[in-house]
């Protein structure tokens, strides 16, 4: 970041922390160690970017509102986390937030750094599937974590993330999301969110984890490609209204920080309980296909380690860590 942008970010931070009062040009000049005329020029540039700033003679400046578009500064204003999102890498257009997050993590990015984009051109889902990520219509976000966990536990972070997103969607939109094991969130049987967890690890320790999430927020049905139009949905389609993307991101980060702290202190039981509150098709018939066999079974929930719990072909409870699931089965 160049010196001018750094100064501008500090200026926004000062204004954002004092929205209920004016800050004199003299005070800003002293804190930022630049002239009052330079302060005035920065204010004019911020107004060009969409910031609404009120300036009054003998009183100073105060910020009235931030631009609608997402940026590092707009996200930090009103974000009340302790460590998550304190470093933000924001891009207007990007191939994938996962790619950038991996590179940032390899370069030493801190625990809690987030990568966010207005648009992804190569959005990444599970099993190398693509994830449709249009400009300014959704949340395309990756979180870098450096947890003190055994590598085999990293998959539990996917389930934790799913509970966080389900809680945010329910509490902020009043919609009724369900979590489809292991990583999708559905509303009325249509996908609104996908989660991808990747890591770099040694045999017994994790170097870093990158949790990526794509959330369809303000798309209309016609904005989806035809091949996914009947399977995908958005918060707007399901609720009939637009949603403030910045506000949703801030809630996600706040909820995630709390849930992650609880998980690191108490382990998986609270995640399991919350996950099963939102679990899709629990108690219902599903089709299961593994490399060895396929059968119909009742979905029982998730195990203490996050595995899918179902009945094997002989009616005995079994754990599945990887399987092809047919979710829409009908009992005969």
Labelled PLM ranges:
Residues 179-183:
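Alpha/beta catalytic cores of group-transfer enzymes, especially the acyltransferase/condensing modules
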Residues 2-163, 167, 243:
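N-terminal lobe of the biotin/lipoate ligase/transferase fold
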Residues 2-34, 48-49, 159-177, 187-332:
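Long, positively charged amphipathic alpha-helical accessory segments at protein N-termini or as interdomain linkers
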Residues 87-88, 112-114, 139, 178, ...:
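Structural motif
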Residues 62, 185-187:
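Short, active-site-adjacent cap segments at secondary-structure transitions
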Residues 39, 97, 141, 184, ...:
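Residue-level signal for inorganic ion chemistry
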């Amino acid at each position: 970041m160049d010196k001018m942008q750094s100064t501008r970010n500090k200026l926004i931070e000062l204004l954002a922390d004092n929205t209920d009062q004016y800050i004199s040009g003299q005070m800003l000049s002293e804190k930022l160690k630049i002239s009052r005329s330079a302060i005035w020029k920065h204010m004019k540039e911020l107004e060009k970017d969409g910031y609404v700033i009120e300036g009054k003679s003998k009183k100073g400046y105060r910020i009235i509102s931030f631009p609608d578009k997402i940026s590092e500064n707009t996200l930090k204003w009103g974000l009340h986390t302790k460590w998550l999102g304190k470093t933000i890498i924001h891009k207007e257009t990007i191939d994938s937030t996962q790619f950038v997050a991996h590179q940032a993590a390899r370069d030493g990015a801190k625990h809690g750094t987030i990568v966010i984009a207005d648009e992804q051109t190569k959005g990444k889902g599970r099993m190398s599937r693509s994830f449709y990520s249009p400009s300014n219509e959704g949340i395309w976000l990756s979180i870098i974590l450096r947890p003190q966990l055994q590598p085999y536990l990293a998959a539990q972070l996917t389930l934790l993330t799913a509970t966080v997103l389900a809680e945010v969607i329910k509490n902020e939109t009043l919609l009724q999301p369900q979590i489809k094991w292991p990583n999708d969130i559905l509303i009325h049987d249509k996908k609104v969110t996908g989660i991808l967890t990747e890591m770099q690890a040694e045999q017994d320790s994790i170097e870093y984890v990158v949790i990526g999430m794509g959330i369809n927020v303000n798309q209309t049905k016609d904005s989806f490609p035809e091949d996914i139009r009947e399977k995908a949905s958005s918060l707007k389609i399901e609720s009939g209204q637009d949603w403030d993307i910045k506000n949703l991101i801030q809630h996600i980060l706040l909820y995630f920080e709390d849930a992650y702290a609880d998980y690191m202190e108490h382990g998986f039981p609270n995640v399991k309980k919350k996950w099963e509150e939102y679990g899709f098709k629990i108690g219902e018939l599903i089709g299961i296909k593994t490399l060895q066999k396929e059968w119909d079974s009742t979905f029982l929930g998730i195990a203490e380690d996050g595995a899918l719990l179902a009945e094997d072909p002989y009616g005995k409870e079994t754990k599945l860590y990887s399987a092809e699931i047919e979710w829409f089965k009908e009992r005969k």
